[in-house]
Amino acid sequence: MIPRTRTLLQSKIPITRYFARCWAPRVRYNVCRTLPAAALHTNIIAHNEVKKDDKKVHLGSFKVDKPKMMIAFTCKKCNTRSSHTMSKQAYEKGTVLISCPHCKVRHLIADHLKIFHDHHVTVEQLMKANGEQVSQDVGDLEFEDIPDSLKDVLGKYAKNNSENASQLPHPSQK
């Protein structure tokens, strides 16, 4: 005799057998029929095209550079200074963890998805709550903190750059 908790709709068929007989074949069939492999590609193209008189007219496309942010910090565990880049969107709307290159400890930089905290939090808020100093000024950068890929762009604003850097205007001054 099958226990009552394992039956479906007062029938004597166990739940697992019921789903195996009735639901599973239909679900597999519907998923395969409604999501062909080419449909995803076609939907993406449809946003860039408009039908006019049964002809597709290309609207155009453009490339948008994703804004990036750079962070330089000293790991409190191993006292190693490092700098990293991240997307601005991830910092403002997602969760960002950065791994220390020396000791491999992960540092929480931003948590807007509430994975680690019950509210939206950024590293700036955490440091200010602990009474630590946070600087967003490009002029506070040390030349050694800047990643090699950004030295051409940000190196001229670093404090300890060559003598030519002192003659360049600060980014806030135009």
From Swiss-Prot:
GO terms for molecular function: protein-folding chaperone binding; zinc ion binding. GO terms for cellular component: mitochondrial inner membrane; mitochondrial matrix; mitochondrion. Residues 1-47 form a transit peptide. Induction: By heat shock (at protein level). One of its GO terms (biological process) is protein folding. It is a peripheral membrane protein. Its cofactor is Zn(2+). Changing D111A: Abolishes interaction with SSC1, and leads to self-aggregation of mtHSP70 and accumulation of uncleaved precursor proteins. Binds 1 zinc ion per subunit. Zn(2+) binds at C75, C78, C100, C103. A zinc finger (DNL-type) spans 64-159. The keyword Chaperone applies. The keyword Mitochondrion applies. Present with 1520 molecules/cell in log phase SD medium. Involved in protein import into mitochondria. Acts as a Hsp70-specific chaperone that prevents self-aggregation of the matrix Hsp70 chaperones SSC1 (mtHSP70) and SSQ1, thereby maintaining their function in mitochondrial protein import and Fe/S protein biosynthesis. May act together with PAM18 as co-chaperone to facilitate recognition and folding of imported proteins by SSC1 in the mitochondrial matrix. Interacts with SSC1; binds to the nucleotide-free state as well as to the ADP- or ATP-bound state of SSC1. This is Mitochondrial protein import protein ZIM17. The lineage of its organism: Eukaryota, Fungi, Dikarya, Ascomycota, Saccharomycotina.
